[in-house]
From Swiss-Prot:
Descriptive protein name: Phorbol-12-myristate-13-acetate-induced protein 1
A Pfam family of this chain: PMAIP1
GO CC term, one of those recorded: cytosol
Annotated tissue distribution: Highly expressed in adult T-cell leukemia cell line.
Effect of residue 32 to E: Loss of interaction with MCL1 and of increased MCL1 degradation
Localization, UniProt: Mitochondrion
Oligomeric and partner information: Interacts with MCL1. Interacts with BCL2A1. Interacts with BAX. Interacts with BCL2L10.
UniProt entry keywords in alphabetical sequence: Apoptosis, Mitochondrion
Mitochondrion keyword on record: yes
């Protein structure tokens, strides 16, 4: 974007070990999956409450 400028004093992040990156990635994927699972369970509960016409 033309309006944004990069910070001049930005320091590059230190190199991480591959195992540490794998753990962080797995943790983030787990959180993402947990959020999706919770949303699906909530939607199922709502649909059971409001669509119980059978």
């Amino acid at each position: 974007m033309p309006g944004k400028k990069a910070r001049k004093n930005a320091q590059p992040s230190p190199a991480r070990a591959p195992a540490e990156l794998e753990v962080e990635c797995a943790t983030q994927l787990r959180r993402f999956g947990d959020k999706l699972n919770f949303r699906q369970k909530l939607l199922n509960l709502i649909s059971k409450l409001f669509c119980s016409g059978t």
